[in-house]
Regions:
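Short, Lys/Arg-enriched N-terminal segments with co-localized hydrophobic residues
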Residues: 1-3
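A short, conserved, highly charged catalytic patch centered on acidic carboxylates
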Residues: 5-6, 12-14, 19-24, 31-155
């Protein structure tokens, strides 16, 4: 079998392999928006231009996504941890393996990731379909890890 990673999935492949139906739905329309802090506004004001002009995924991750996740963690009293660039090997035989952009996990930041986990994929520049395929694959990987570790506190990712 040829080794695949999360990033290698194409949308049609992931839909077929995991027997999915794509449905467009408005999931969060009833949520009340919250105001961002002065810190986040100032940080994004400084970093946004640089991140967008650099054109790299890594710069967008470091200068746009990470500050937003840190703000979310602060608002939620550090009740979840943010892990960046961690390998999540859920099921190598099905291609559910490889590096995740971000993993959000229960509890405070620690050396051992606490389940349940949630995989977060950054938008891919000019390629929504590729990012969506990677996101679906990583969410399946996270689901496998969560089910495997249902009765345990920590996982080895």
């Amino acid at each position: 079998m040829i080794f695949m990673a999360y990033r290698d999935f194409k949308l049609a492949e992931v839909v077929k392999q995991f027997e999915l139906s794509l449905v467009n739905a408005r999931l969060f329309e009833d949520l009340v928006p919250i105001n961002s802090s002065n810190w986040l506004n100032e940080t994004l004001e400084i970093s946004l231009n640089f991140a967008l002009k650099s054109g790299s995924e890594k710069a967008r991750s470091e200068f746009i996504v990470a500050p937003i996740l840190l703000e979310m963690e602060r608002i939620n009293n550090q009740n979840f941890a943010i892990y960046s660039g961690i390998n999540l090997d859920a099921d190598k035989d099905r291609g559910l393996s490889g590096e995740c952009d971000f993993i959000l996990a229960r509890g405070a930041m620690n050396y051992a990731i606490q389940s349940p986990i949630f995989a977060l994929v950054e938008a891919k520049k000019n390629d929504v379909e590729s990012g969506l395929a990677q996101c679906i694959a990583q969410m399946f990987g996270a689901q496998i890890i969560n089910l495997r570790n249902h009765d345990e506190n920590s996982i080895s990712a």
